[in-house]
């Protein structure tokens, strides 16, 4: 039996923990306007950079900022589970798909609906759908590396902002979850960096 797409105890724990803590006291927020406050640019060395990441200071802003990249990662991983030919790329896609499904479920429970794919995400998906074999694997891993670099920038920016009062449990829980997420994001950056040297060659 293929166990790539089976949920692991770590993923179940993270999903249930986030839902059980962050749903306390969450109300509707102006997430659409928050999303519009962020713009993206290309950097020659590190790929995607977020302009305005330092403005992410609350858990609501953080949720709004990561929703798009997480959704893009989920869509590309859905495609890669079916089309990837490199076994390591396919395995990574299976793990990433389950993690992003869990995160999207959490975001929706908290009132954060991922925005429609932007022009860059649409172009990436179009490129992937047109590719086959090793070219597809390379396009997928490259996209995953850039997406996780972006998520790392967002998460580190949020955690570097002034800490909330310890009595503000909603914000404290948000930072706890971001801290856990950052470790996984860094792990995925390292994995995709290694994979980028072997896929498509």
Language-model region placement:
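N-terminal secretory signal peptides
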Residues: 1-15, 19-36
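His/Met- and acidic-residue-enriched segments that coordinate or traffic transition-metal cofactors
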Residues: 40-201
